[in-house]
């Protein structure tokens, strides 16, 4: 069979010019459609940026820094600096554990808690906004109300909201929706992040940049201070409880609950999971 006979006997080869034209048209349409979408997305993005620029441009000379514009002063390092201080801090912090069983008595003096929060207040923050509020609760009735709110939400969290794998991962820690430590611990420290500032008359003021990161850094310093004071704590982040707890404490709308810390001395015979922390080689990369 010669080439002409092969072409005439094959429907595909016989109509190849039409097929070629059809495929070429499909390719051209796809290219135009893709290019049109790409241009449309770029245009929308540019348009959005232009709107934002115009919005800020309207402020003109009204823009003022949130901080008072003062001359810088010489840096004064902290006191009692020690070259071995980092190692001493590590030895201190390696003993820190999450404690879920607290003694109601003896109760640490409130001044100790105040000093720990003072230390937390030295944390850096975006544009020096210091976007944090520490609510220290020691009244038994108020602690019971907090526990009631948290346990109601946690029951729903464990039974409905949380993924089964999450609940399974928590099993070795022996945690559930019952939070006895909320009434056992002599102190509860509720750490709120401030998403923006408020004036004395409740008017919204400056934006608080990186408020969650800033408040989280401060919370880490607080944990170090509590450990240095010989106090035990537990970092908790109650799901879906923030608004109710904020209202209970009468906090303003610009504050959102970030962390709830039970604080006190561990109960006699208190046990913790047999866990090991990662080695330095697993958490540090040197270049």
Swiss-Prot record:
TM region positions: 15-34
Effect the entry attributes to changing residue 158 to F: Moderate decrease in catalytic efficiency and reduced affinity for substrates I-Tyr and I2-Tyr
Keywords assigned by UniProt, alphabetized: Cell membrane, Flavoprotein, FMN, Membrane, NADP, Oxidoreductase, Transmembrane, Transmembrane helix
Membrane topology: Single-pass membrane protein
Organs and tissues of expression: Expressed in spermatocytes.
Note: Named condet in honor of Dr. Jean Francois Condet who discovered that ingestion of iodide could reduce goiter.
Name of the molecule in the record: Iodotyrosine deiodinase
Organism: Drosophila melanogaster
Organism placement in taxonomy: Eukaryota, Metazoa, Ecdysozoa, Arthropoda, Hexapoda
Gene transcribed to yield this protein: Iyd
């Amino acid at each position: 069979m010669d080439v002409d006979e092969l072409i005439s006997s094959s429907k595909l080869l016989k109509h190849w010019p039409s097929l070629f034209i059809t495929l070429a048209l499909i390719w051209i349409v796809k290219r135009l459609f893709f290019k049109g979408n790409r241009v449309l997305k770029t245009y929308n993005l540019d348009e959005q940026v232009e709107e934002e620029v115009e919005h800020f441009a309207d402020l003109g000379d009204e823009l003022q820094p949130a901080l008072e514009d003062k001359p810088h002063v010489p840096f004064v390092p902290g006191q009692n600096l020690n070259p071995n201080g980092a190692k001493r801090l590590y030895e201190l912090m390696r003993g820190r554990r999450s404690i879920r069983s607290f003694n109601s008595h003896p109760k640490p003096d409130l001044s100790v808690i105040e000093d720990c929060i003072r230390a937390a207040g030295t944390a850096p923050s975006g544009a020096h906004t210091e976007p944090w509020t520490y609510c220290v609760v020691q009244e038994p009735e108020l602690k019971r109300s907090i526990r009631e709110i948290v346990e109601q939400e946690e029951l729903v969290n464990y039974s409905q909201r949380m993924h089964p794998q999450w609940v399974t991962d928590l099993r070795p820690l022996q945690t559930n929706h019952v939070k006895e430590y909320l009434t056992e611990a002599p102190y509860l420290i509720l750490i709120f992040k401030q998403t923006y500032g408020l004036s004395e008359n409740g008017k919204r003021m400056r934006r608080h940049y990186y408020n969650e990161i800033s408040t989280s850094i401060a919370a880490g310093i607080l944990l170090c201070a509590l450990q240095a004071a010989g106090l035990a704590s537990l970092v908790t982040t109650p799901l879906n409880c923030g608004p109710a707890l904020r209202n209970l404490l009468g906090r303003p709308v610009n504050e959102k609950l970030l962390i709830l810390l039970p604080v006190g001395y561990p109960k006699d015979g208190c046990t913790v999971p047999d866990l090991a922390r990662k080695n330095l080689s697993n958490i540090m990369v040197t270049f």
